[in-house]
Each structure stands twice: as C-alpha cells, then as structure tokens.
Amino acid sequence: MRKSTIVFAAVLALQAQAHPSRPPRPGVSTPGVRIPMKKLTPDAVYTIGGAPDWMAIDDETWVSNGPKNMVARMDPKSTTFVTVPVGKEPCSGLAAGFGSLWVPNCGDSTITRVGLKDGKVQATFPLTIADSEGGVAVGAGSFWILTDTHGTLARVDPDTNKVVAEIYVPPGSFAVAFGEGAIWVTSTERSVVTRVNQYTNLVEASIPVGPKPRFITVGEGGVWTLNQGDGSVSRIDPKTNKVSATIDVGVPGGGGEISAGEGSVWVTAMEYPLTRIDPSTNRVVQQFAGDGGDSVRAGHGWVWLTHLRTGLVWRLDPRRIEATR
C-alpha cells in the first residue's frame, strides 16, 4: 500500500522533494511469465472512487479510503457497496474479527470499530499508529498493532478496547500478522521478522529475511514477507523459524502488498499490479505488467485487487487469473 492517501498536488510535490525517487522495478525475466495487464479481465468492478487502499475479508470484503475518511463494504455477489464514515485518514491496514472491522486512522490517531453485520460504528478509541504504511491483525483473542517507531507492539482486548500488553520488538516494525499459532512482526529497519508467543507475549525468535521487509502474510504453508529493499519475497517455515525460500519478484521500493490464499501467494506493486507465486515450487508463475494495483487480498474463492489511482476495486476468480496467458 502507498505511504499516504493524501492526493493534493502540493502535498505530492513536497513528498517528491523529501523522498528519493523509487528504484527501477525490473520485474521477473523468466520466459513466459510476464503478461500484459490488459489481458486480465475482472469478474466484477467496484467503482469506489477516491483512493481505495487497505482491505480485509470477512463474509464480505472491506476497503479503506483515506481521502474520503471512510471504508466501503463490497458485496461479493454483485458490484454494489455501502460506505461507512470512520476517523480521519484510515491507514496502515484493516482487520476483521470479534464482530468488528478494525480501522486505524492516522489523521486523528484513533481506532474505529465497525460492525461487520450492520456496518455501524461501534466504538472509536485513541491509539497511536507507528506508520501509515503497515498492517494490523486479529487473533489469539486480541487486536494487534504497532504504536510507535521504536517497536512497541500493542495487544488490545476487544471486550474493553484497552491495551492489555505491550511487547517490545525491533525498531522500525510496522506490520503484524497472525497465523500458525503465533504473532509475526516485520522490522523494516532491522530486516528481521519477530515471532511472538500468543500466550506469554514473549519474543520466541528473531528471523533474518530479505532487506527492508514491510508487508507480511500467513498461509499456504508459510509466513511470507514482501521485502521493499530488493523486491523479493521471503518464505519462513513456521516449524523451524528459518527462511526456506527467497523468491525474486523484481518490485523494490515503497508500497505494495502481499496475501496468501486460494492456492497461491499474491503480490501487488505499481507497474506490476499482480504477481502470482506457486507455493509448491516457490516460483513466480505469472506477473501482470501495466497500470493498476496497490492492495491485494485472497479469500472465499476470490482475489481482490485495488487500483488506487483510478478508484476501482477488482474481484477476480483465481482460476481465470491462472488461465490468462
């Protein structure tokens, strides 16, 4: 996902002066893997408007929209959606659990809870957010979020919306995921993944991965990180706490996202909106090149892909993706 959802030209100009240009994105060079994005046909298109970004999947799929200070709930059986106002500038991921959609808001340092069934705001409570480009998680009876750049992982009780534990992980940690019986946190600054015990809140392992890991997902037999330093993906074996594969995806630089599900691992980045990795071989088997992309989620029989710059969200049948050549 992109660093900020603010789209005013003056702000973008200031960002261009403050940050170096994105490194070239070569993609993969394996013959037969690269496919023009225009060949990929979505099963449904949701015209969200604004800048649809972070997503979460429950019975329906949710997407945040920072410029509009809202989230949208998309019906997976049609192209309809409803919008829900939340806090200022929703950012840094979405998570669905305990009857709620959990929405971090960078503009006012709050968390908004939205009812998954009725789409109504249940609560809004103050909590700092480490970075606008990160990720949150639900699992082990809690909501998890990084709250500062020093590496503070907060565990929130969904019954009280109160922080009940703070776990100290490496600095520059911004994204967290839950799965395989543990909490997993990427440190972009230290290029490691921290494994946290869900019962004791203690750090169990620190696992070196590729350079500058940011986004993380659990599924398809592994823990996977998208490494912004060189555009690679690291696969961690949760049984050994070691990297079992490093996959060159060719998408270095900021933004992007990764999701495991529907038999594949999916990566999105500007210029290469969708890349599919086969977890049985740890190889990139398809890479779609062209415009679009920014956030990806897989689940309940679909792959969901945001097109940040055009305000669209695509719903895709993974079988249709695999058949596209």
Regions found by a protein language model. Give the residues of each.
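Bacterial N-terminal signal peptides
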Residues: 5-15
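Predominantly soluble domains enriched in secretory-pathway, periplasmic, or organellar proteins
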Residues: 15-325
